[in-house]
């Protein structure tokens, strides 16, 4: 059994902070319109980026205890990315500030549990403030502003995202792909997306993106569970003979069938991906019929007297392209009959009109949109591969942030909404060490303004003093233009959901670090340095 090393109390917390600092100090230099770039050493060629979560994910520290701190702050970035797709750098900065300020006070004798409670209470108050100040996003101009700011002030990207949303709706499917030219453009194609990914990650043919993309694939649709290779041998023989790829949509694919498919994928003898059917119960049956109509196939169901083993060619659907990752499947340009698709949309519309329950109406409208709507594709072009990757990251961030803005509205950007929220905490009087937690949040939420100023070459304290002297809640420092002005009027705005999520995730991780009393990790006599840890 391998030896373990244990670190306790203040030593443990200080070591965690060291790890947090190494990640946060690398990430926070990218904050704001004048944020700097970070070059990542990849196996093929360096990647230049200012995307916080991308940078954070690349950092692994030699010291195992410090790496624990690094992983915790990386979790802040990942959670924020998952929730909103943007705001990871701000979230990382807030977590670092709360942890550092908290550890100072705990070292001076403050009670960690009470400090944590104070942080949680203050965070709730700031979230309330943000929701009260949030402004609903209405009109094309406001959406362009959000998208442009989130794309590091790239107006071309802002306009493209807005156009895409207008074409397919704010809840429509928008994907980002490489362009075959140097131009960045928008294309809208018919398609359907549902929230089911591949049944096994071993089916991901692109291991970097963790997805599989098929051009002109066959699509097998069934409401049965596939657990034996015998069930699908006739289908696989046809697909293999034509050199085509295959998407399997079934209740499940497991057992011998899944193992055999994965083995053939690894060997390169088959290009196949299996996903679970979307929905549940009767809704699943209806959605499978939607997919069948869209792709020109048949739902192979024993209720219809059909069996997989008795497969015929006409049962297979097809599409121009299919993309599958861990969470979703997108079918683009199904080869189904246009008239049948239109008839299916009319049937669903009639069901919407007679449905009584709101839930049922909502689900039917979603199906109608997926069947009758389209997929907007932003095709990204650039002079070099490095520039292309960086541009795609910015577009992804801007796309997610814009959707978040439509969902919860926007607040003044440039770190000002959090900065102004600090004043609302002045009236809180919790007493004892809970008040210490409030002061920690109050101090930390001013840091984004300081960091944006520092990255723009200005003195943070000077910028903070200028903003504080002005009574208008929208007054702040526009780093892009290097002027002080009404940021909301200038179009410097942030999605409320992004700011809120980043703050809540930062407070959550900070609370965990501040209440940590021991760290335990493996100890390798040959590789690991000796520290203040106890080795057992």
Swiss-Prot record:
Biological process per Gene Ontology, one example term: protein folding
Annotated positions binding ATP: 30-33, 86-90, 414, 494
InterPro entries linked: Chaperonin_Cpn60_CS, Cpn60/GroEL, Cpn60/GroEL/TCP-1, GroEL-like_apical_dom_sf, GROEL-like_equatorial_sf, TCP-1-like_intermed_sf
One GO CC term on file: cytoplasm
Any Pfam family the entry gives: Cpn60_TCP1
Keyword Thylakoid: no
Catalytic activity: ATP + H2O + a folded polypeptide = ADP + phosphate + an unfolded polypeptide
Isomerase among keywords: yes
EC number per UniProt: 5.6.1.7
Domain of life of the organism encoding this protein: Archaea
Locations listed in the record: Cytoplasm
Class in the EC hierarchy, top level: isomerase
CDD domains the record matches: GroEL (cd03344)
Keywords for the protein's UniProt record, in alphabetical order: ATP-binding, Chaperone, Cytoplasm, Isomerase, Nucleotide-binding
Entry's Gene Ontology molecular function annotations: ATP binding; ATP-dependent protein folding chaperone; isomerase activity; unfolded protein binding
Family under the similarity heading: Belongs to the chaperonin (HSP60) family.
Assembly and interaction partners: Forms a cylinder of 14 subunits composed of two heptameric rings stacked back-to-back. Interacts with the co-chaperonin GroES.
Function noted in UniProt: Together with its co-chaperonin GroES, plays an essential role in assisting protein folding. The GroEL-GroES system forms a nano-cage that allows encapsulation of the non-native substrate proteins and provides a physical environment optimized to promote and accelerate protein folding.
NCBIfam families: GroEL, PRK00013.1, PRK12849.1, PRK12850.1, PRK12851.1
Name the record gives this protein: Chaperonin GroEL
């Amino acid at each position: 059994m391998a030896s373990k090393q244990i670190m306790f109390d203040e030593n443990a917390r200080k070591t965690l902070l060291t790890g947090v600092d190494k990640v946060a100090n690398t990430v926070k230099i990218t904050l704001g319109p004048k944020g700097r770039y970070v070059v990542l050493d990849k196996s093929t060629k360096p990647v230049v980026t200012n995307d916080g979560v991308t940078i954070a994910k690349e950092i692994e520290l030699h010291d195992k205890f410090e790496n624990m701190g690094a992983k915790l702050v990386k979790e802040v970035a990942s959670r924020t990315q998952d929730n909103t797709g943007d705001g990871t750098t701000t979230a990382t900065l807030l977590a670092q500030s709360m942890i550092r300020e908290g550890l100072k006070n705990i070292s001076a004798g403050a009670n960690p549990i009470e400090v944590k409670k104070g942080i949680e209470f203050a965070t709730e108050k700031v979230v309330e403030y943000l929701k009260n100040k949030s402004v609903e996003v209405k009109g094309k101009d406001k959406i362009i502003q959000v998208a442009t700011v989130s794309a590091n002030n790239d107006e071309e990207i802002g306009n493209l995202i807005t156009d895409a949303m207008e074409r397919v709706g704010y809840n429509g499917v928008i994907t980002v792909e490489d362009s075959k030219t140097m131009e960045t453009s928008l294309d809208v194609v018919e398609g359907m997306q549902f929230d089911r990914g591949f049944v096994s990650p071993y089916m991901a043919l692109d291991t970097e993106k963790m997805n599989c993309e098929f051009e002109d694939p066959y699509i097998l649709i069934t409401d049965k569970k596939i657990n034996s290779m015998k069930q699908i041998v006739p289908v696989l023989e046809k697909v293999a003979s034509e050199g085509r790829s295959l998407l399997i949509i079934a209740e499940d694919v497991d057992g011998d069938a899944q193992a055999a498919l994965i083995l053939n994928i690894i060997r390169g003898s088959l290009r196949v991906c299996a996903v679970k059917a979307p929905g549940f119960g009767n809704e699943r049956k209806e959605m499978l019929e939607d997919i069948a109509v869209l792709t020109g196939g048949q739902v192979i169901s024993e209720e219809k007297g059909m069996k997989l083993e008795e497969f015929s060619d006409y049962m297979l659907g097809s599409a121009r392209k299919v993309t599958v990752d861990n969470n979703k499947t997108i079918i683009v340009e199904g080869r189904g009959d246009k008239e049948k698709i239109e008839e299916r949309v009319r049937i669903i519309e009639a069901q919407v009109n007679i449905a009584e329950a709101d839930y049922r109406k909502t689900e039917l409208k979603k199906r109608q949109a997926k069947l009758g709507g389209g997929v907007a594709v932003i095709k990204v072009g650039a002079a070099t591969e490095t520039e292309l990757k960086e541009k795609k990251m910015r577009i992804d961030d801007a796309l997610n942030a814009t959707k978040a803005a439509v969902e919860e509205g926007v607040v003044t950007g440039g770190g000002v909404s959090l900065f102004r929220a600090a004043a609302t905490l002045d009236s809180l009087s919790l007493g004892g060490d809970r008040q210490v937690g409030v002061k920690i949040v109050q101090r930390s939420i001013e840091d984004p303004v300081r960091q944006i100023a520092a990255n723009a070459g200005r003195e943070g304290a000077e910028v903070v003093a200028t903003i504080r002297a002005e009574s208008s809640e929208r007054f702040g420092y526009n780093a892009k233009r290097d002027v002080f002005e009404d940021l909301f009027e200038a179009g410097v705005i942030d999605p409320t959901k992004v700011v809120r999520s980043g703050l809540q995730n930062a407070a959550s991780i900070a609370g965990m670090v501040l209440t940590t009393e021991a760290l335990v990790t493996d100890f390798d006599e040959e590789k690991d340095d000796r520290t203040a840890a106890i080795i057992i």
